[in-house]
Regions:
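A general structural motif
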Residues: 77-83, 101-105, 123-126, 145-156
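Peripheral (often C-terminal) accessory segments that flank ATP-dependent C-N-forming ligase machineries
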Residues: 18-94, 98-99, 103
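Short internal beta-strands
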Residues: 98, 121-133
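Single conserved hydrophobic/aromatic residue that forms the stacking wall/gate
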Residues: 1-12
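Glycine-rich phosphate/diphosphate-binding loops that line cofactor/substrate pockets in enzymes
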Residues: 85-97, 116-119, 158-164
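Peripheral docking tails and interdomain loops at the edges
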Residues: 146-147, 152-227
Length: 227
C-alpha cells in the first residue's frame, strides 16, 4: 500500500495533511486510531499499456512500467483485490485457462490455485513442465505445446482461436528458447486482449478471489461508507 493510498483514499481523515501540520509545528487533534488500524483493506492495482507498445515484452522488471493505478477498498483482501483487478481491465475467465508457471518455486506457489480452479469447474491447459508438475500432484490438465515444439494443440493457436480466457505465464529463466516461447505467448495475449498475469503471487491471489467471491455478492460502496 503506498503512502498516498494510506494517507488519502484509505482514511476518512487525511493523514498527509496531519503529517504536514506536525512538521510545521501546528496544533493537531490526536487521531483515535493507529495509522494501520483499519476495518477494511486497500489495494492498488497497476494499469499497463503494453497493447500500445508494439512488440514490447509484457513482463515486469525493476523499471516503472505502469501508466496508471486504481486504488480500491474492500471489507477483506479478496474483495479489495478483485475490485482493483476488475477496475484496471481484467476479466473473470469463463472456462479455459493457460498455465505456464515458471520455476520450481513458482510452480509450488501456484499449485493450490490450480486445484481451486479445477474445483470450480475450470479447464486447465499447461505447457510441458507445468503440465507434468500438475499431473504429478493430482491436478488434471491438458498438455499444450510451445511455439518451438512440434505437436498439437499449440498454445499460440489456441490463443488466436480465442479458446483461452486467461493466461498465467511466469518467466522461468533467461535461455533463448524460454524467452522466445514465453514472449510469443505473452505478446499474443496482450495483442488479443486476453488477460495476462506474469507474477505467481498475484495470480494465486486473483484466482482465489474470483473463485470464492460471487460477482453478484461483490459489494459496491462509496468511499464514505468505509469508516
Amino acid at each position: 500500500i503506498s503512502c498516498s493510498l494510506v494517507g488519502s483514499e484509505m482514511c476518512i481523515r487525511d493523514r498527509i495533511e496531519l503529517a504536514t501540520k506536525v512538521m510545521l509545528g501546528l496544533p493537531v487533534e490526536k487521531p483515535n486510531k493507529s495509522l494501520f488500524d483499519f476495518d477494511y483493506v486497500g489495494i492498488k492495482a497497476s494499469q499497463f499499456s503494453f497493447n500500445r507498445l508494439q512488440k514490447a515484452d509484457p513482463v515486469l522488471g525493476v523499471d516503472m512500467a505502469s501508466t496508471g493505478e486504481v486504488g480500491c477498498l474492500g471489507d477483506d483482501s479478496g474483495t479489495a483485490l478483485l475490485t482493483a483487478m476488475l477496475s484496471v481491465g481484467h476479466r473473470i475467465p469463463k472456462k479455459n485457462i493457460l498455465l505456464s508457471t515458471g520455476g520450481a518455486k513458482q510452480k509450488a506457489d501456484m499449485l493450490e490455485a490450480a486445484r481451486t480452479l479445477k474445483e470450480h469447474g475450470y479447464t486447465l491447459y499447461a505447457t510441458g513442465g507445468t503440465s507434468r508438475y500438475l499431473t504429478e500432484n493430482g491436478v488434471a490438465n491438458h498438455l499444450v505445446y510451445w511455439p518451438s515444439e512440434e505437436g498439437t494443440p499449440q498454445a499460440l493457436t489456441m490463443l488466436h482461436n480465442r479458446e483461452i480466457d486467461m493466461v498465467v505465464n511466469i518467466p522461468k529463466d533467461l535461455t533463448v528458447s524460454e524467452l522466445s516461447n514465453g514472449y510469443k505467448i505473452r505478446r499474443a495475449a496482450v495483442d488479443l486482449n486476453i488477460p495476462l498475469i506474469t507474477n505467481s503471487r498475484l495470480a494465486s491471489a486473483f484466482i482465489q478471489a474470483f473463485c470464492h467471491i460471487d460477482m453478484d455478492d461483490l459489494p459496491i460502496k462509496s468511499w464514505s461508507e468505509y469508516k
